[in-house]
Design a protein with these regions (language model features):
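Solvent-exposed, low-complexity, intrinsically disordered
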Residues: 1-120
Length: 120
């Protein structure tokens, strides 16, 4: 039973991430920066958690990098994922040094699409 739930989560990971990215885009248009960043984090972390079957309590950049390498994901895609997370963190905690939110949004879509292609 648990393996069926895990498999279902993995299959739906991209769809769920795209819904979260859609919500993030709405917050971006409304200039609600905190809500935008929250949805970006949920989309990114949720996607890898569901796709790679990593429990939320074990999510870290190191664990995700290791799991992506185990799935034969390119180093470039792994690095792009980490950079996108870093951009979100920078936007949240050091706003003056951060990339524009529209750029972060575009990166989020790109990295999730690349990971979906490579992981399958």
């Amino acid at each position: 039973m648990q393996s069926n739930i895990t498999l279902l989560k993995s299959r739906r990971a991209n769809k769920v991430a795209m819904k979260r990215l859609s919500a993030a885009k709405k917050f971006l248009a409304l200039n609600k920066n905190e809500d935008f960043l929250d949805e970006m984090f949920r989309a990114l972390w949720g996607f890898v958690s569901d796709k790679l079957q990593i429990p939320v309590s074990e999510l870290s950049k190191e664990n995700v990098s290791f799991a992506l390498a185990g799935k034969k994901v390119s180093g470039e895609s792994t690095q792009l994922f980490i950079q996108t997370l870093d951009a979100c963190e920078l936007a949240r905690f050091a706003k003056s040094m951060a990339a524009p939110n529209a750029e972060i949004y575009r990166q989020g879509i790109d990295v999730i699409s690349k990971l979906e292609e490579e992981i399958g």
